[in-house]
Amino acid sequence: ERFAPRYIELVIVADHSVATKYNDNVTAILSWVHQLVNNIILFYRDLNVHFTLSAVEVWSNGDLINVQPEATVTLNLFGEWRERDLLNRRMHDNAQLLNNVALDDNTIGLAYDEGMCDPKYSVGIVKDHSAINRMVAATMAHEIGHNLGMNHDGSQCNCGGNGCVMSAVLMQQHSYQFSDCSKDEYQRYLTNHNPQCILNQP
């Protein structure tokens, strides 16, 4: 194995816009979120990164932060909320906000680079932008990739197919593989930062 195993305990928050999109059908939302995680698990197999879904929170009664089109602002507020609120009641390593708000500049996701395990910065936001689960999962896997030190792929990066996970553009014909560049960047991140929270097996 090129990579030692790592274990990410994930919390996914579905905001009020997602609750509304699914007509407040929490069962449907949970099913969708479980499918997302199952897809993310597949994408990360090559990196020996294992995911468990620690919790799903659905903001049925209204958002607990001010979710807004400016993605950087929403991401910052979500990180602050995680540190202040979520971490105090739920052990986890990383939190992702699933939303259905029209984000500025056609953004479908945003995350902090190298944020994994940091109380505020181990977060991402992902738009529920497709009826194809794998497409949304690819975006969430991409944002978690940023948290794990991966940058966008340049033209020289290769994953043996179209559209690697860290490609700047999401394509229908995605290969859902991490490129050689991503693997090198992930390895460098582990070496330089060795984020402690993902060492323990849940």
Swiss-Prot record:
Q: Which residues are glycosylated?
A: N25
User: Pfam families annotated for this entry?
Assistant: Reprolysin
Q: Which Gene3D superfamilies match?
A: Collagenase (Catalytic Domain)
Modified after translation how? Glycosylated.
State what this protein does.
Answer: Has fibrino(geno)lytic activity on the alpha and beta chains of fibrinogen (FGA and FGB). Inhibits human ADP- and collagen-induced platelet aggregation on platelet-rich plasma but does not affect the thrombin-induced aggregation of rabbit washed platelets. Slightly degrades plasminogen.
Which reaction does this chain catalyze? Answer: Hydrolysis of 14-Ala-|-Leu-15 in insulin B chain and 413-Lys-|-Leu-414 in alpha-chain of fibrinogen
Q: What is the native source organism of this protein?
A: Macrovipera lebetinus
Query: Which amino acid positions bind Zn(2+), per UniProt?
Result: H142, H146, H152
Organism ancestry: Eukaryota, Metazoa, Chordata, Craniata, Vertebrata
The record places domain Peptidase M12B at 6-202
EC numbers for this chain: 3.4.24.72
Q: What is this protein called?
A: Snake venom metalloproteinase fibrolase
Q: Which UniProt keyword terms apply here?
A: Calcium, Disulfide bond, Fibrinogenolytic toxin, Fibrinolytic toxin, Glycoprotein, Hemostasis impairing toxin, Hydrolase, Magnesium, Metal-binding, Metalloprotease, Plasminogen activation, Platelet aggregation inhibiting toxin, Protease, Secreted, Toxin, Zinc
* Record has Oxidoreductase as a keyword: no
Extract one GO BP annotation from the record. Answer: proteolysis
Q: Which cysteines are joined by disulfide bonds?
A: C117-C197, C157-C181, C159-C164
Q: How does it assemble?
A: Monomer.
